[in-house]
Amino acid sequence: MSKADIVVGIQWGDEGKGKIVDKLCENYDYVCRSAGGHNAGHTIWVDGIRYALHLMPSGVLNKQCINVIGNGVVVNPDVLISEMAQFENLEGRLFISDRAHLNLNHHALIDQARERLKGDKAIGTTGKGIGPSYEDKISRNGHRVGELLEPEKLCENLMKDFELKKTYFDVLGIAMPSYDEILKDLKRFKEVLAPYITDTTRMLWKALDEDKKVLLEGAQGSMLDIDHGTYPYVTSSTTISAGALSGLGLNPKEIGKVIGIVKAYTTRVGNGAFPSEDLGEDGEKIGLIGKEIGVSTGRKRRCGWFDAVAVRYTARLNGLDTLSLMKLDVLDGFESVKICKAYEYKGQEIDYVPCDLENAKPIYEVMEGWDKVAGIRDYDLLPENAKKYIKRLEELSGVKVGYISTSPEREDTIIL
């Protein structure tokens, strides 16, 4: 029996998981999404063409891969159908768990209305309705993908739900959709998605029993984890490696190696603590060179320096075996680069992540910059200062770097 490997983001998301999964999946038979929804965005560049994925696993660009959307994902049928239209011959290559929960239009309307009402205390959600979808799931009022196979019955149940929520909808200023509108959409969803809906847990058990190679693709980042992230400025799912197990129906004995994806600097979308954020020229420069615009939201990402304290924390949470260092080329040309090696917290220097991270200030180590790493595919050809930077990140995080990305292109990846 084979074991599944996991790729997980270990900052605040947007680390470059899509590129590394796309690179790795040529060695895997299955690539699987386990959590989140279309709030997560993966960008992949192949031969100069940009692909933006939100629900589809990143293995879809490799035709030998079978792609699985697991039970832990919340699926918006409209978004998924739109993404599927970019690709040909998906039957037999894409499967959706019948146990995955649905994300529908009213979830997004609730999300957006609540954010407006919170004003300056808004979480900064993507407005895609992911939180409300998970709320319905946890309160046992949700609906699952498998229910799309009986659209009339699902429509009746949704109308009953809406009637119960009528007062809440009125407060938020949301108009209740009509039965006919909903049924029309549900029938369309069934027509397109029915061939792809199945029990993906049993499928993966069988694959592992047959020694197939399986890669689990995390969404978002560990610092956004519902339990271990910067609460309440977090997502609504478990984004650490443990979540990949429940999100696909696997057990701990079925896991092989865990690869942590990390940028050579740090970014964050939305509100919440970010100790190493740089609000000056360097932060602006990083964002400009790195094209730090959210794939799902179109919002500018906040930018700052590598936070080794946070990475060491998430490395332990995830049980990392190796790091994949992304976007090293973005730091090309900086005279010096900084690493947050510790925090100043309530008058003391600490080397851990407190639950009130907003009260921590960065303590930096400054290193000399380098000229250019962009496009380099051989570690020995990297500038010495870039090598010193990588080595220092390994020392501070406690994890060896196994992959280095030097451009958005698939092939510009150093494998150590």
UniProtKB/Swiss-Prot annotation:
Pathway: Purine metabolism; AMP biosynthesis via de novo pathway; AMP from IMP: step 1/2. GO terms for molecular function: adenylosuccinate synthase activity; GTP binding; magnesium ion binding. Binds 1 Mg(2+) ion per subunit. It is found in: Cytoplasm. One of its GO terms (cellular component) is cytoplasm. Its EC number is 6.3.4.4. It is an enzyme of class 6 (ligase). Keywords: Cytoplasm, GTP-binding, Ligase, Magnesium, Metal-binding, Nucleotide-binding, Purine biosynthesis. The active site is at 14 (proton acceptor), 42 (proton donor). GO terms for biological process: 'de novo' AMP biosynthetic process; IMP metabolic process. SMART domains: Adenylsucc_synt (SM00788). Substrate binds at residues 295-301. Mg(2+) binds at residues 14, 41. GTP binds at residues 13-19, 41-43, 301, 327-329, 405-407. Pfam families: Adenylsucc_synt. Plays an important role in the de novo pathway of purine nucleotide biosynthesis. Catalyzes the first committed step in the biosynthesis of AMP from IMP. Homodimer. Belongs to the adenylosuccinate synthetase family. This is Adenylosuccinate synthetase. It comes from Campylobacter lari (strain RM2100 / D67 / ATCC BAA-1060). The lineage of its organism: Bacteria, Pseudomonadati, Campylobacterota, Epsilonproteobacteria, Campylobacterales.
